[in-house]
């Protein structure tokens, strides 16, 4: 079982055994824009979901706090996201951190759920209690960067995505709002003209109200060609 460890702003550490990992998809707050994105993907051969927003169960062992992600080929890339981590039963037991959902784009055209289970979900090593940021979530910025030059490929505030409160209600309805559940938010649009197929990805949450940030970063290391 994967165990994640998070440092909180007060210096304390919280550990959680990951029992359930879920990746939200097509989770923009403006579902009209989401549908336009689905139509664009369909032209590229990526099958659309039957309903939006979507929610994809992912093998819990794919949740990782790591500096390197192995990839089978050169057509994989990250997605900057936030993540909810439930550590207990109380309101202060829901943590918010940054995450990067590394996705197999070659497999994605055959099935989004398959692509989500082909690579790691990388999470930050720090977290904030959701109760501490709930009042200004929409002001928190989410950025994705690629390459050694840290070129910005994704930039928005959390106002672009469905809220943690929305997803907590979904989890309660599914009986999954319990310790060990980790949910990634779904991502924001990529900036046109920036190559997503990079050997380095990072994601960052920036809180301008409390003047702090959380970051995760990793190299993408392509596996050797198979024999046989």
Indicate where each model-derived feature is located.
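Catalytic-core "active-site belt" of small-molecule-metabolizing enzymes
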Residues: 1-182, 189-228
């Amino acid at each position: 079982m994967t165990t994640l460890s998070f440092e909180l702003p007060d210096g304390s550490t919280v550990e959680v055994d990951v029992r359930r990992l879920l990746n939200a998809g097509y989770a923009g707050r403006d579902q009209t824009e989401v549908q336009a994105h689905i139509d664009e993907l369909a032209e590229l051969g990526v099958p659309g979901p039957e309903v939006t927003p979507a929610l994809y169960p992912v093998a819990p062992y794919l949740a990782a706090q790591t500096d390197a992600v192995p990839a089978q080929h050169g057509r994989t890339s990250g997605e900057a996201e936030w993540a909810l981590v439930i550590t207990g039963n109380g309101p202060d037991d829901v943590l918010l951190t940054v995450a990067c959902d590394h996705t197999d784009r070659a497999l994605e055209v055959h099935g989004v759920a398959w692509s989500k289970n082909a690579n790691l979900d990388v999470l930050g090593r720090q977290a904030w209690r959701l109760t501490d940021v709930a009042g200004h979530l929409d002001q928190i910025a989410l950025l994705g960067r690629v390459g050694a030059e840290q070129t910005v490929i994704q930039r928005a505030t959390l106002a672009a995505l469905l809220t943690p409160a929305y997803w907590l209600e979904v989890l309660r309805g599914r009986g999954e709002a319990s310790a060990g559940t980790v949910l990634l938010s779904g991502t924001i649009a990529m900036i046109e003209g920036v190559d997503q197929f990079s050997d380095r990805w990072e994601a960052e949450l920036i809180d301008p109200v409390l003047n702090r940030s959380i970051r995760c970063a990793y190299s993408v290391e392509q596996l050797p060609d198979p024999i046989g």
